[in-house]
Amino acid sequence: MAAQIPIVAATSTPTVARNSKKRPASPSHNSSGGGYGASKKKKLSASGFAQGVSIEAMSESKMASSELSSGPVEKAAKPLPFKDPNFVHSGHGGAVAGKKNRTWKNLKQILAAERALPWQLNDPNYFSIDAPPSFKPAKKYSDVSGLLANYTDPQSKLRFSTVEEFSYIRRLPSDVVTGYLTLRKATSIVP
């Protein structure tokens, strides 16, 4: 069989300079022998019968080499720990069966479907779950600007974040101070 394999002479190096920016396989170098242009098509059409023989010989040589290398070299595919081996995608059939792939529901659709379910009064929901308070201290925000407040005015008990806010708080009348404190749901010390 090896005697039937045609020997093709090596092609000459491309005439395009190697310093050019384009690769030799680009369409602009069609005239060269190394590119994927009309020259490759000519080679394929010229060797019609010989090509069929060479493909047959190559397939036989691949089979022979695969028989030699069919030892315990291949490792078994180890399943990934984060993937569920029993997972089946919800799109039955998919594009192979000619059906359109099913899309995942967005959050709005999920919440609407959840609201439509027949809930009982004693069923747990997000609002009925009792959780202990957080161990992290609550962040304190300025009563005037809403920025993170590192300071508290000892006189009015209002929180502030900058010197300008402090001077503004000191000039506020007492009824405005109590209004800020009630917005924060803090008890007013000043009567």
Swiss-Prot record:
Record's keyword terms, sorted: DNA damage, DNA recombination, DNA repair, Nucleus, Transcription, Transcription regulation
Superkingdom of origin: Eukaryota
GO CC annotations, alphabetized: cytosol; fibrillar center; Ino80 complex; MLL1 complex
InterPro entries associated with the record: INO80C/Ies6, Vps72/YL1_C
Chief subcellular location: nucleus
Segments of this protein annotated with the region Disordered: 1-41
Keyword DNA repair: yes
Subcellular location: Nucleus
Keyword Ribonucleoprotein carried by entry: no
Coiled coil: none
Gene Ontology BP term (one): chromatin remodeling
The protein's assembly and partners: Component of the chromatin remodeling INO80 complex; specifically part of a complex module associated with the helicase ATP-binding and the helicase C-terminal domain of INO80. Component of some MLL1/MLL complex, at least composed of the core components KMT2A/MLL1, ASH2L, HCFC1/HCF1, WDR5 and RBBP5, as well as the facultative components BACC1, CHD8, E2F6, HSP70, INO80C, KANSL1, LAS1L, MAX, MCRS1, MGA, MYST1/MOF, PELP1, PHF20, PRP31, RING2, RUVB1/TIP49A, RUVB2/TIP49B, SENP3, TAF1, TAF4, TAF6, TAF7, TAF9 and TEX10.
Stated role: Proposed core component of the chromatin remodeling INO80 complex which is involved in transcriptional regulation, DNA replication and probably DNA repair.
Identification of the protein by name: INO80 complex subunit C
Originating species: Rattus norvegicus
Lineage: Eukaryota, Metazoa, Chordata, Craniata, Vertebrata
